[in-house]
């Protein structure tokens, strides 16, 4: 399973857990209405310094050999919960939403997913949580108002597998004299 496939499964599970859109940052589609979470992959491959584990496997046919290399690097994803101050009508009464409070609660809920509640979904996506940072303010000025944002980073470990077809020698060709 590729890193992107694993990441998409993880993001889908997070979306189900928090109940708001979880969107990849810096995309060209219009941004959803708040509240929402945006994420970015700040590092998709941080090796641990090892060479990996090598093994031989069978290829497409019985005569093909494949050399398989596996390792367990880490990846860092950054999550930012976004909201704005706003009012809405709830059955005839005005309700005021403080964007900073909503963004912090959403960031805390997402942190809880990585710290505890989402452990089965995280493992099912092929990741193990290594570290979760604290949620800090990432407020940003949006035209005429402040976009209230709280964000945190998550470091995840996953298994990376690379495979390469290799040739095998049926009968070596020996040139020159062989001394016994």
Segments the model singles out, each with a brief description of its role:
Residues 1-5, 97, 101-104:
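Soluble non-cytosolic domains of exported or imported proteins
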Residues 1-66, 170-180:
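Small/polar-rich, solvent-exposed N-terminal microdomains that initiate assembly or binding
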Residues 36-37, 77, 127, 152:
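A broad, low-specificity signal marking well-ordered, structured residues that form hydrophobic/aromatic
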Residues 36-38, 153, 157-174:
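Histidine- and aromatic-rich ligand-binding microenvironments
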Residues 47, 87-89, 160-164:
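Residue-level signal for secondary-structure boundary sites
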Residues 67-69, 142:
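Outer-membrane beta-barrel proteins
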Residues 69-88, 93-97, 110, 147-158:
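Oligomerization/assembly interface segments of phage tail-like spikes and tubes
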Residues 105, 112-162:
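Acidic-leaning, charged glycine-interspersed low-complexity segments
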């Amino acid at each position: 399973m590729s890193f992107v496939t694993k990441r998409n499964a993880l993001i889908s599970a997070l979306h189900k857990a928090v109940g708001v859109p979880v969107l990849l940052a810096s995309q060209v589609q219009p941004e959803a209405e708040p509240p929402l979470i945006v994420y970015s992959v700040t590092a998709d491959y941080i090796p641990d310094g090892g060479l990996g584990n090598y093994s031989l496997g069978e290829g497409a046919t019985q005569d093909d050999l494949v050399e398989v290399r596996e390792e367990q690097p880490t990846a860092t994803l950054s999550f930012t919960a976004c909201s704005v101050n706003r009012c809405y009508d709830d059955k005839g009464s005005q309700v005021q939403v403080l964007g900073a409070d909503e963004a912090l609660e959403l960031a805390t809920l997402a942190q809880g997913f990585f710290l505890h509640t989402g452990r089965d979904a995280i493992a099912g996506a092929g990741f193990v949580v290594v570290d979760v940072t604290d949620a800090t303010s990432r407020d940003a000025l949006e035209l005429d108002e402040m976009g209230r944002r709280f964000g945190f980073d998550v470091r995840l470990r996953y298994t990376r597998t690379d495979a390469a077809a290799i040739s095998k020698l049926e009968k070596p060709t020996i040139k020159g004299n062989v001394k016994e």
